[in-house]
């Protein structure tokens, strides 16, 4: 939480084209971990849509006023914990955005889409190496 401003500053200063926001199943279970994950994404969305960045100098201010990432990818990590028959069916039909794991972020995803920022969603399980490369390639080729 205390580093969120620094992430936004770095993202704007480097003019990052693609943003990956990774979360895990704790966002769906509730508690303080869920609050941190959901609030972090909301902070990111608010900063992008409202262009509320801290500016260190005039050049950064000029760059920041025009900045908008080309893509935001929301990635649900630890898929080995929540991947069930419903997830498999949605995966086959290329409709993973409808999975319940993305429900806590749905309102902010809609806000991004209304603001003209393309979004993608994906699953991965980094611990076992499932779908990690495919997700990153998908992000880079979007």
Roles of regions detected by a PLM:
Residues 11-12:
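Structural alpha-helical scaffold elements that stabilize or flank donor/cofactor-binding regions
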Residues 15-142:
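Conserved GTP-binding G-domain of TRAFAC-class P-loop NTPases and closely related GTPase folds
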Residues 1-5:
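Switch II (G3) loop of P-loop NTPases
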